[in-house]
């Protein structure tokens, strides 16, 4: 039996008249359609009308559409809105940058930025290995892709690969406390990708090659870039 998945979760806002027992109608229809109800909330309640948000997991997008259509077909219900919970989670992306140090006073600013930061720059210029100790480099990974082999979806290109790279970066942070950032390149040329990684390498302690079809990048990076990498 095919299982429902939170990856296809939807929230449907439905309204109906209380005397017609809309909650019973909603649960009956969704159960009949083979979905899994995970939440049911009363959003509005009046004497002559009740608005209910029902959240359920579907099998796939087609199944979600079928559930919505079945609710819409009921003579005692009116579907107001359908929200795809996965799309909602991705609104605005899944990552953000936050400062590790407070910038509350002039003293804070003077040490974190100018003029104090100049001494840090000079120290690294004198001994480049200090970059790992005094910057984000030692705990930062670039998640690099050209979008040529995105999950099981094929060659979707760099923009469409970005949600996957955001997710990989979130996993780095959650499970290893490593700061990772997506780098989606608008090229599928091996030399251009390797050269780009070379150019951005000063910022990162590691490179994660993700969802890239060609296997040439690994050996090329080994020979050209002094940096940790993973595929």
Please report, for each region that a protein language model flagged, where it lies by residue.
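Metallocofactor- and cofactor-centric catalytic cores in central/energy metabolism, strongly enriched
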Residues: 49-52, 78-215, 219
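Single conserved hydrophobic/aromatic residue that forms the stacking wall/gate
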Residues: 216-231
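A generic "cationic amphipathic patch" detector
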Residues: 43, 67, 84, 156, ...
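Conserved protein kinase catalytic core
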Residues: 45, 151, 226
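Short, hydrophobic/aliphatic alpha-helical segments
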Residues: 7, 139-142, 224
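A conserved regulatory-domain signal marking ACT and ACT-like small-molecule sensing domains
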Residues: 1-91
């Amino acid at each position: 039996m095919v299982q429902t998945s939170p990856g296809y979760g939807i929230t449907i806002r439905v309204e109906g008249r209380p005397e017609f027992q809309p909650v019973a109608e909603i649960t009956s229809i969704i159960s009949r359609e083979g979905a899994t109800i995970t939440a049911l909330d009363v959003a509005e309640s009046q004497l002559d009308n009740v608005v209910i948000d029902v959240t359920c997991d579907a099998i796939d997008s087609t199944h979600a559409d079928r559930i919505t259509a079945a609710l819409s077909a009921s003579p005692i219900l009116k579907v107001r809105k359908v929200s795809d919970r996965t799309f909602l989670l991705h609104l605005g992306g899944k990552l953000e940058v936050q400062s590790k140090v407070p910038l509350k006073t002039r003293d804070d600013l003077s040490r974190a930025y100018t003029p104090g930061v100049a001494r840090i720059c000079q120290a690294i210029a004198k001994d480049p290995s200090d970059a790992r100790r005094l910057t984000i480099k030692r705990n930062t990974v670039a998640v690099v892709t050209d979008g040529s082999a995105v999950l099981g979806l094929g060659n979707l290109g760099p923009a469409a690969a970005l949600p996957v790279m955001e997710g990989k970066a979130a996993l780095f942070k959650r499970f290893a406390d490593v700061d990772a950032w997506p780098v989606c390149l608008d090229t599928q040329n091996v030399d251009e990708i390797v050269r780009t990684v070379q150019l951005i390498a000063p910022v990162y302690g590691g490179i994660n090659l993700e969802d890239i079809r060609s296997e040439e990048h690994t050996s090329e990076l080994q020979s050209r870039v002094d940096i940790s990498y993973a595929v």
